[in-house]
Amino acid sequence: MKVTLPEFERAGVMVVGDVMLDRYWYGPTSRISPEAPVPVVKVDTIEERPGGAANVAMNIASLGANSRLVGLTGIDDAARALSKTLADVNVKCDFVSVPTHPTITKLRVLSRNQQLIRLDFEEGFEGVDPLPLHERINQALGSIGALVLSDYAKGALASVQQMIQLARKAGVPVLIDPKGTDFERYRGATLLTPNLSEFEAVAGKCKSEEEIVERGMKLIADFEFSALLVTRSEQGMTLLQPGKAPLHMPTQAQEVYDVTGAGDTVIGVLAATLAAGNSLEEACYFANAAAGVVVGKLGTSTVSPIELENAVRGRADTGFGVMTEAELKQAVASARKRGEKVVMTNGVFDILHAGHVSYLANARKLGDRLIVAVNSDASTKRLKGETRPVNPLEQRMIVLGALESVDWVVSFDEDTPQRLIAGVLPDLLVKGGDYKPEEIAGSEEVWANGGEVLVLNFEDGCSTTNIIKKIQKDSDK
């Protein structure tokens, strides 16, 4: 199926809400502390990622949309780290600095893919003057297609009702990820996106989909919402709108590693899609696909346009399919955090034949994920001659990405993938043919990183060149 993504580049979205910094400390655990019955983690990796409303803004920016973020921070290292990280991913920040408060920070300690503890550094922003937030919203209303209010009950949305009225008066849809049981404060919102537990905390326990629909429609009427989207984890999503039949969407997640930030991804994709001019139903479709991708990643994460397109084409997982080099590196980093072994190979793969399929299947068996690096058209011409490739790069990559054995496909323009391999550093580098390991491009870099290099045999009698010769011979008859 050919999927047409929304025109995200023409979408402008402002996110207002509780901004926070997520810190992750990773390391191995091999002993128990003599001081107390707790594991000792030897921290070897530290990561900092924007969280809360900042993660929503990152999700919007990762799609290529114009993302603006407004929130409350302290004047500290965490605020500076947030500003720098967000600027690097094209989020325009306009924070209101509160000198009496620290920037909200969540520190998570992980070992062997397990979160051991979370430490929160925060002081609620309740009582802070909301006027600077209102001014920033007013200034942006003429240039945005959606306003997201991201509520984590930390005080940034204490005046949420005034914010809703400002946007609705300007004709800008308001999307809210709610917190708590007081839905009255969100009265008049365009769309509310509670998860099932948040929904049932307000509407009561539901024993069936019929009860979810009935009670959801009552909430819409009681609080004058335009729509309600209930996210239901492994049961997917349910969209409710007055005068329309309920829309149930099954989950697209294949594996669930971490639900951290999944709600941020959902509302971010919803807002960007609506701001691009698509319908609410279409926005929910893309948001559901994006949720299936992001829960397969560890920690708060974003979804790229390529990952989203792969997901709606039926390749929903940790960015499987055709990728850019930057997206590949991110996917590999996530795989390593899950303890997966990454295998990498490369080639032209011009006319895919049984020998290729067998070789790639055997390579995949050597690890958990298989990367296939493909020569670009220009690289192929230099290597094979002016008549090659027969199939252009895009078609070669799509065919490879459709193979069950292949997880990620990426292209390179050079004569060899040495630079690409040095950047990815797979655990195992594989090449087919009669090479010696030391002759394989990238082998030195992989060995230096502690990885392995292996030569696999191709299936006898299978050759793209022979296939081309046979076609030419038959056409001459």
From Swiss-Prot:
Signal peptide: none
GO biological process: ADP-L-glycero-beta-D-manno-heptose biosynthetic process
Broad class of enzyme this protein falls into: transferase
Reactions catalysed: D-glycero-beta-D-manno-heptose 7-phosphate + ATP = D-glycero-beta-D-manno-heptose 1,7-bisphosphate + ADP + H(+); D-glycero-beta-D-manno-heptose 1-phosphate + ATP + H(+) = ADP-D-glycero-beta-D-manno-heptose + diphosphate
Chain positions recorded as ATP binding sites: 195-198
The family this protein is said to belong to: In the N-terminal section; belongs to the carbohydrate kinase PfkB family.
Assembly and binders: Homodimer.
UniProt function note: Catalyzes the ADP transfer from ATP to D-glycero-beta-D-manno-heptose 1-phosphate, yielding ADP-D-glycero-beta-D-manno-heptose.
Protein name (database record): Bifunctional protein HldE
Gene from which this protein is expressed: hldE
